[in-house]
Amino acid sequence: MRRRMGAAALEMDAAPGSSGQTQRRATVAARLPSQHWPQRSLLIVAVDAHTGEPIVFDRHSGVDLADAVTASTAGPGAPPHRIGDNRYIDGGYRSPENADLAAGYKRVLVLSPLGGRTRAPLDWGMHLAAQADELRARGSRVETIFPDSNSRDAFGVNLMDPSTRPPSARAGYDQGRALAGQLTEFWH
């Protein structure tokens, strides 16, 4: 499935340095709070459009933060993002949450904007329930947060639509305040 999605994206591939890729990267970079990788651990997942294999970018990858985010969000209807000789598509094709990357942590809080849904085959082990079960089997406490109805209504069907940001932020803030007590218990 990831290879098929990559092949579809490659059909729309823009030439290296084309104005489309340059503009998309500039848009992503402008939305970031910083152009530098944070010192704390941040893992950003993308999928190699040629092989379908996932790649995890971090501050040690030798890739600019803006490129990692642009690659990780090159979703349906967008060409893959080029980094060097490679082309990458949305890391959500691997898993919308990628919770398994938190293996080894005592507590794992998963924010699942798609409510745990995925199109990946069950035997891939990329469904959120399977990832959470594996984390628990390794000793992690896992808490999952799914959007409530107000949050789902606020972000609508296109998660990348910038016009939904303000209402989504308000709805998420309200949901977070409602869950604050539960999450305080989880962290202590």
Give names to the regions the model predicted.
Residues 1-188:
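Patatin-like phospholipase
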